[in-house]
Amino acid sequence: MAKEFSRTRRIAQQLQQELAMVLQRDMKDPRIGFVTVNDVDVSRDLSYAKVYVTFFEEDTELVQQKIDALTVAAPYVRTLVAGRMKLRVMPELRFIYDSSLVEGMRMSNLVTQVINKDKAKQQQFTPDTPDNSESVDGEKEQD
């Protein structure tokens, strides 16, 4: 049986798609730049929507400037999205920076560094002599 999705989840998914389209095509503000909409959480009464976004920049000052620009543009974005969606109540948009992507990349780099260090230590302490298993097998064949 297929998993059922609640109405708020379906609206959140559609809102995410529409926001991505509007931010990519209709927003001309150079302060915002390239924005990725990662997730949208809509309140049960559809009055608020938390929009989780990421940017290419990792500098916290630039990220905060972009979030501020999105916050100022939120009523305009809300109007554009409302024209695309058929909802009685269009949620108020709250833009939030999603740092999970940056944190995930940082964690992945740390794991890679640890693996490389372990390989280097293993190669350092492993002798360069050939395995004794071949000579043992060879002796058994001679018997």
Swiss-Prot record:
Keywords: Cytoplasm, Ribosome biogenesis. Pfam families: RBFA (PF02033). GO terms for biological process: maturation of SSU-rRNA. InterPro entries: KH_dom-like_a/b, RbfA, RbfA_dom_sf, Ribosome-bd_factorA_CS. Its main location: cytoplasm. The keyword Ribonucleoprotein does not apply. GO terms for molecular function: ribosomal small subunit binding. Residues 122-133 have a biased composition (Polar residues). It is found in: Cytoplasm. Signal peptide: none annotated. Residues 119-143 are annotated as: Disordered. GO terms for cellular component: cytosol. One of several proteins that assist in the late maturation steps of the functional core of the 30S ribosomal subunit. Associates with free 30S ribosomal subunits (but not with 30S subunits that are part of 70S ribosomes or polysomes). Required for efficient processing of 16S rRNA. May interact with the 5'-terminal helix region of 16S rRNA. Monomer. Binds 30S ribosomal subunits, but not 50S ribosomal subunits or 70S ribosomes. Belongs to the RbfA family. This is Ribosome-binding factor A. It comes from Shewanella frigidimarina (strain NCIMB 400).
